[in-house]
Amino acid sequence: MRDFGKKINKYNLKHTYPFISRSSNTYIVPIYEEYHTELLPDSILNTESPEDFVEDFPHRNAINKVYVSRALLPHPQKGDNIIFYMTGGYYKSVVSTIGIVEEIKTNFIDENDFILYCRKRSVFPEDKLRAIWRYRNSKPFVVSFLYVYYFPYRINMKELIDLKVLGGVNDAPRGFKPITEDQFNIILKATKSDESFIIN
């Protein structure tokens, strides 16, 4: 029987979903505007129309999704929290969504193995995934994550700087940007989040 007690099982994250730990490592990760709501439709922005996101694509409906990256270190690990940051500039960039990392996948056998792993959970169509794989000699890695929560109120880059989550415009995340537990708590408060899914 599924256990809904407030604890995290890092060996089987689905078993204790949707809870995440406040004390886990947390990263802010950028996502381009054109991919944001395609991957995270529950986090649709006020400037977007729901009618543009009604088609039944697997990656939109799945709780388990993937984020393809070539970012340099540091990288998150299983059980870490990731906060998605839609890029767009000083006022338009916003943090919108929390996920929890289920797996970091690096050891793909070949291109087809990469495609098979990503295609139903990524925003990218197969031809784009193939282009990503072939782009450089250094191969991408994939973060498989569980979608957890979207922020009721989205704070932008300016607010993140004012709150000292970011150190300035040049501190905007380009890869996986680690933040402290205190900064995570600041984001939760500023976004007016219901913290019932958060445990210590």
Label for each model-derived stretch:
Residues 31-74:
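Short N-terminal edge-element motif at the start of the domain
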Residues 5-11, 62-66, 78-80:
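Short linear interaction motifs
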Residues 71-88:
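Short coil-to-beta transition motif at edge beta-strands of beta-rich domains
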